[in-house]
């Protein structure tokens, strides 16, 4: 994960991408924040993403294991049984982040994460279901925690983590006021496996194992298992006024750098990207994408501009919107691999929000699935061609954003 050269990592002076203009505040504080992070040693001590944490409603985790086993490279590993949650560990390998899939046992259970859901109409429809955040690798958890607390970042106490059935060998921040996600820190020797403790009795649940095996058999039958790669990026949506603060906050808590922002005027939004400062592929530590409106919803009636991002946030609250996975470059069955994968999954009844957008000439093709009825998360597939290094084209992201906005509008009408 790290080596002695990490102490010399530099987070500033890296190439900037995009055409979005930021405020003077952002451009002033960005280099100051990154330089201070490098200078105090946090950049060197904080590594990539070790795990993602997702919670679902009582009785729904087995079905979500099936969904993820079919649509992603993840494998069911074990289940940890704690007083208020079942936590299923899903893993590709030790070179990609785990997924901690948590199922609440009691539908009447309340905690801080349910309270965040209850504030928003769509979030309240699934009161327990939400993406919690990421766990990051650190070389010295105690020192990182001390430095971050000195910088006024707040963390759950070990007793609070135990009460929440979250691993106490991980230091976890309080939910962000800008994204409502958390960031955790876990210390682990690079040559050891990830362990989350003490989360109760560890076992392989027969129902989970059976469901997982059937989904993987179907994935193999559809001939798509070797085409779907690890996570490429994680995309969060927030309010327009919080865009720059959300970026600076994540940069302060991680060892990522600001890759750049693109203005998407057709959708009244921007797409903003942060990447690991280490020269590692996104499969090892996914990029973080933040999307926000250019103008807040309170002036939409004046200009009549589209507002799919702000509408999503108004309905669900600031949160993760989609998980993007890479698709291996190439062709199968006379189709580009991404088209082959999408057609195969669609044949099993899984919906997609639009046709695959982009082209080989443009450098990449992308598509959004329909939102999961269990987690509300969208799966994005991305196939890059040749040496294309970006995460989207402006035309692609405009069409994807519009399609997601149409789906959210239809869901709202049905309620």
Regions found by a protein language model. Give the residues of each.
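Hydrophobic, helix-prone linear segments
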Residues: 1, 21, 28, 34-111
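Vicinal oxygen chelate
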Residues: 2-45, 47-59, 79, 90-92, 99, 113-154, 171-175, 230-241, ...
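ER-lumen resident redox/N-glycosylation machinery signature
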Residues: 38, 80-81, 105-126, 176-177, ...
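Conserved small-residue-rich
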Residues: 50, 55, 64, 226-265
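Extended low-polarity, hydrophobic cluster-rich segments
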Residues: 68-69, 131-134, 181-183, 250
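Long, well-ordered mid-to-C-terminal structural blocks that present hydrophobic/aromatic surfaces
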Residues: 256-315, 320-322
